[in-house]
Amino acid sequence: MQDTVTTSALLDPSHSSVSTQDNSSTGGHTSSTSPQLSKPSITPVPAKSRNPHPRANIRRMRRIIAEDPEWSLAIVPLLTELCIQHIIRNFQKNPILKQMLPEHQQKVLNHLSPDLPLAVTANLIDSENYWLRCCMHRWPVCHVAHHGGSWKRMFFERHLENLLKHFIPGTTDPAVILDLLPLCRNYVRRVHVDQFLPPVQLPAQLRPGDQSDSGSEGEMEEPTVDHYQLGDLVAGLSHLEELDLVYDVKDCGMNFEWNLFLFTYRDCLSLAAAIKACHTLKIFKLTRSKVDDDKARIIIRSLLDHPVLEELDLSQNLIGDRGARGAAKLLSHSRLRVLNLANNQVRAPGAQSLAHALAHNTNLISLNLRLNCIEDEGGQALAHALQTNKCLTTLHLGGNELSEPTATLLSQVLAINTTLTSINLSCNHIGLDGGKQLLEGMSDNKTLLEFDLRLSDVAQESEYLIGQALYANREAARQRALNPSHFMSTITANGPENSVG
């Protein structure tokens, strides 16, 4: 009995005092008249288990714990999930995607790394969400609208442009670009390169006999500065529609030299051959590249009778009257709709050549001669051409030393022309009388929507009244756009003689 009490006390101290008190009162013997008092001293208290029975933990037995949204019962992953994870980890070695169900394909694409080799992903993955992640991973600013709204097209166009901008002739392996062409040829439609690096010029080592007796240097051969030749690139892009080039060097710092910015004769010949062979090219831009008359004529000659060319931009170069005559010939031998020769060296003879071609042209809708020096002689020639031209809608003659004689002829154009919607004569010397002449012409015009006369010495009153006439024309155009059927019925009812005014 003593052993029983001792064991009970070790197991549960709360019962030790009761057992000792009972033993002392009975003198070590159990009383038969009080069995209820002696029962705790006989029956040991069960010990607390360190690993209680699962039923003791109600929370553990619950399969759903509503108050803990992050809790979940540990289960074995589905076999499909294990397979998807394995495919993602080994996609570069075994790129299976087309054989999977659509919902499984989406799971794989959502977890693929954007750093996978293009040889694996280019012609296999068409998901725009995947290419969106690739673009955002490489470039913090992405304007997908400039690339037709396609993230895949944007990725390949910008990736190719980045390679071209950092290509160093004689140093960079051409295979870097040529190997990419089969992967991107179906997606690249626009190439915009604003930098072409020249070859690295190493210091020439003088050989014995290269110096004269006086110690002066002998005659040294001028190093070549030709840039990357675009022939193979353009030929490899079967859907190329726009080519925008600037032969310039950025961030040259202390390594500045004038020959870094040369558009060489060989560059010109190579580029001319490339664009002549590209029968899908619709827009060609070559700006800020010091293109003179000779190089411009080479470029323009390669574009004669081009089947689909619609826009030519040679702005901000060194093109003079000879280059303008070449552009005038192009107007007669192409389907060109936009011609931009802004900020060049075109004078009156060049403008007269363009005017002669414009008088018989039926395709051109926009002509930009801003920041040249055609003066009144060239301006009047263009005004005469516009009296017969029925297709031009936009004319920019800002900053061309124009004055009142040109304004007088343009007022006659405004009275009879029904296609022009935008004219810019800013930064000229139109004068007070010229402004009045233009106002008189605007009184009979119902189609012009924009007329820029800033910094042209026009009286404030004339400028205000011209603005009122433009507002009326824009309001009428808006009404026609909102209800074209009503406008046509009105013309039919009133007859053609009453349709204006």
UniProtKB/Swiss-Prot annotation:
Alphabetical UniProt keywords: Cell projection, Cilium, Cytoplasm, Cytoskeleton, Flagellum, Leucine-rich repeat, Repeat
Annotated InterPro entries: DRC5, Leu-rich_rpt, LRR_dom_sf
Subcellular compartments: Cell projection, Cilium, Flagellum; Cytoplasm, Cytoskeleton, Flagellum axoneme
One GO BP annotation of this record: microtubule-based movement
Protein name: Dynein regulatory complex subunit 5
Presence of keyword Metal-binding: no
Subunit comment: Component of the nexin-dynein regulatory complex (N-DRC). Interacts with DRC1. Interacts with FBXL13/DRC6, DRC3 and DRC7.
Functional note: Component of the nexin-dynein regulatory complex (N-DRC) a key regulator of ciliary/flagellar motility which maintains the alignment and integrity of the distal axoneme and regulates microtubule sliding in motile axonemes. May play a role in the assembly of N-DRC. May be required for sperm motility.
Region feature (Disordered): 1-56, 202-222
Gene source species: Homo sapiens
GO cellular component: cytoplasm; cytoskeleton; sperm flagellum
Biased composition (Low complexity): 24-34
Compositionally biased region (Polar residues): 1-23
